[in-house]
């Protein structure tokens, strides 16, 4: 099976906010930021690792470290991954709902831009 490299994009709201970037920048633990960025590097190389669908086109990428970090993303075709939002196990339900809202918004705005 051939590995498919992926381009990572970060979701931005209509108001110009980047929820994932804001979350990542707010992390105080530098080691956590390094682990998350390393995980995203592997995604770019085509290795999604531990992930699952959470519904409506949104996927959860799990990072088994600390409180159980999760990154939520949508995928455009086979090669583009759009990082929507992130959190940990304690905020999982809220984060999934928010990620689905962001993904719906992303798809809606992308379809009107064409």
Regions found by a protein language model. Name each.
Residues 1-67, 77-81, 88-114:
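Basic, Lys/Arg-enriched alpha-helical interface segments
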């Amino acid at each position: 099976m051939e590995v498919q490299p992926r381009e990572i994009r970060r979701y931005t709201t209509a108001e110009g906010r980047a929820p994932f970037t804001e979350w990542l920048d707010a992390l105080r633990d530098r080691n956590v930021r390094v682990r998350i960025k390393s995980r995203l590097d592997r995604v770019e190389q085509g290795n999604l690792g531990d992930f699952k669908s959470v519904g409506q086109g949104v996927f959860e990428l799990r990072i088994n470290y600390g409180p159980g970090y999760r990154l939520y993303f949508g995928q455009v075709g086979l090669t583009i991954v759009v990082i929507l939002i992130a959190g940990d196990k304690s905020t999982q339900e809220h984060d999934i709902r928010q990620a689905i809202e962001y993904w719906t918004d992303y798809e809606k705005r992308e379809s009107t831009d064409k």
